[in-house]
From Swiss-Prot:
This is Transcriptional regulator MraZ. Belongs to the MraZ family. HAMAP family: MraZ (MF_01008). GO terms for biological process: negative regulation of DNA-templated transcription initiation. Keywords: Cytoplasm, DNA-binding, Repeat, Transcription, Transcription regulation. One of its GO terms (molecular function) is DNA-binding transcription factor activity. GO terms for cellular component: cytoplasm; nucleoid. Its main location: cytoplasm. The gene is mraZ. PANTHER family: TRANSCRIPTIONAL REGULATOR MRAZ. Forms oligomers.
Length: 143
């Protein structure tokens, strides 16, 4: 399970060191793709394959489903962490997420998110007040 908040630096070559506690779960390969709110999502390869299979089962006659599948496939990059646990983020991914040297990696249970540190701080400030209400509304039937 991916949990917690980490603050690795992005180096000049576009490499980001993944948190050590997640490296074993990602050692078999990982998929980096664009996500909501101009962040990046990092999935273990097996989890991403499940997501892609589910997405590909949608009707190809549905324009939204086709667009989603196209964007998902086109925006995804397979990575294998190096010996230091670093992955190289593509220029397109860095641009999409407006990544500076200061990054934040957050656990999102079954995947990781990569954010620019300033964007993550802004996101948190904008959503902090709604956290309790969202918890009540969203999780009412689960918890």
């Amino acid at each position: 399970m991916f949990l917690g908040t980490y603050t690795p630096k992005l180096d000049d070559k576009g490499r980001l060191t993944l948190p050590a506690k997640f490296r074993d779960a990602l050692a078999g390969g990982l998929m980096v793709t664009k996500s909501q709110d101009h962040s990046l999502a990092v999935y273990p390869r097996a989890e991403f394959e499940k997501l892609a299979r589910r997405a590909s089962q949608a009707s190809r006659s549905n324009p939204e489903a086709r667009a989603f599948l196209r964007n998902l496939a086109a925006a995804t990059d397979e990575q294998h962490p190096d010996a230091q646990g670093r992955i190289t983020l593509s220029a397109d991914h860095r641009r999409y997420a407006s990544l500076s040297k200061e990054c934040v990696v957050i656990g999102s249970v079954d995947y990781l998110e990569i954010w620019d540190a300033a964007a993550w701080q802004e996101y948190q400030q904008a959503h902090e007040e709604n956290f309790s209400a969202a918890t009540d509304e969203t999780l009412r039937d689960i918890i």
